[in-house]
Amino acid sequence: MPDMQTSRDTRKIPISKVGVKDISYPIVVMDKNRKFQQTVARVNMYVDLPHHFKGTHMSRFIEILNAYREDIALDKMEPILQEMKKKLGASSAHLEIEFPYFIEKRAPVSGARSLMEYTCTFTGTLAETFDFVLGVQVPVTSLCPCSKELSRYGAHNQRSHITVRVRYAGFVWIEELVELIEGCGSSPVWSLLKRADEKFVTERAYENPKFVEDIVREATLALAAHEAITWFSVEAENFESIHKHSAYAAIEQDKRKA
């Protein structure tokens, strides 16, 4: 049968990324407390395409993914990328995996146990060398210092997302990043709180007001102090409870250039 993908293209325009996006797929993630955790990810797979080829072979991405169906994990990122380059005749390959990860937490006063969900990402790129970035999004509570200063009856507060991405030497647990970052807001959040817990959490947030700028600076101090982390970016978004808009701040730091 004719292979249209390998036919010549005369426009002389190379493509940086082409492939398949938003595949729902089961994966296994290392869990600090339970060894392994099974979850379902959204997967994106791309390669570059030389200017002289009309298209890439989309089915081969799925074939590669299926070949690793029992073993899609962090340590398989580079082998999968190598296989993508080889089977698709590419000079660079990109693999993005986003998944929910669950950590058991105890409420601060009652000790009630509940599972907290964190959105995590594995992003791998292989050209001449392999590059990997671990990402975690951590929800926290933020309470406005200005509102606290001005108001006689309290202060506006809201849920915030702190998103960190790190490169590292050695190994970094997802749990480590969550623990580092949860303390950077006015208060962590929990799935389950009893009345005594709610009192503790709201009072803690009130006593620990943070602007979005404070949050990214606190996160920067925490990430910079971690010996294994070599590069990081941190973003904070406050979903303002008294505004239509969000407040946002971001910092990126390469410790290798310090």
Curated annotation (Swiss-Prot):
EC code: 3.5.4.16
The entry's keywords: Hydrolase
Gene3D superfamilies in alphabetical order: Urate Oxidase
UniProt catalytic activity: GTP + H2O = 7,8-dihydroneopterin 3'-triphosphate + formate + H(+)
Stretches of the chain forming a coiled coil according to its record: none
GO biological process, one term: tetrahydrofolate biosynthetic process
Pathway: Cofactor biosynthesis; 7,8-dihydroneopterin triphosphate biosynthesis; 7,8-dihydroneopterin triphosphate from GTP: step 1/1
Stretch forming the signal peptide: none
Site, May be catalytically important: residue positions: 144
Disulfide bonds: none
General function of this protein: Converts GTP to 7,8-dihydroneopterin triphosphate.
Family: Belongs to the GTP cyclohydrolase IV family.
Record protein name field: GTP cyclohydrolase FolE2
